[in-house]
Amino acid sequence: ALPISWVSGGCFRGMEMVVENRTPEDAAQIVQRICGVCPVSHAHSSAIAAEKAYGIKISNNARIIRNLLEGAQFLHSHILWFYNLAALDYVNPLNALKADPADAYDLAQAAGTSMNSDFVALKERLANFADNGQLSIFSGNWFDAEDGTAYQLPPELDLICTAHYLEALTMQAKASQISAIIGGKMPHVMTLVPGGTAFVPTDQKLDELKALADEIYDWVESTMIPDTLAIAPYYIDALNWGKGCGRYVAWGVFEGPGDYASYTEQMANRYLPMGVIDDKLNLSDVQEN
């Protein structure tokens, strides 16, 4: 039995203390400074907290606009993490110097991934990078090591993925453009306020948003997903690295339409609903209300 239970965390940053005795509008702006990658989520959390406190129900249009803003951040974050923050853990640009560009085109076609980049020109660019010798944090048993690294990809796939790594810099910026149009700027949006949004949609803005979203969608379908499927077989063993306890929690995102009796009910009816996966949890052991 568990007569007393505690929950603790090791990531206290004190932002709640910073916003004490400030107006709700201030809080929504201040807490975003926690992160330059995911400020929208922090702003949303602050605005929702204020709305709960004051009993405010936002309009359906405001709900849609907030979901679009959160979705743009999702697009940016997924592209950023898969390519620009993590890809160099499994993609070796210097190994791409051994690639035959013609074979790289054949492999890209076979893998169903895009061939928008000039692989010949990229290989020349990488050669200049290697000749420069200034590999920064990647020097010493990283890109330039023959042994002792965990890189598994063949040279042609390294060349393809390096090209797409560079393309991803542009694509994640386009996702941030969507956030900037809706939020006034990105990072740290300005239009997200308790009670709704200060963004005023126009035909021109909506057309621009649609064009950017379509471009990102096409790139993810033609590049990011095929790249993932091409890379994964070389790192199957990594699926067991850093394996945790098998307990997962999600708070949900993208508020659905309608009125809900409680905030918990609203969270459960999000397009990506909240939930917990924990096969080891036995609630019968919990005796607290």
PLM region spans:
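Active-site bordering "gate/hinge" segments
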Residues: 1-289
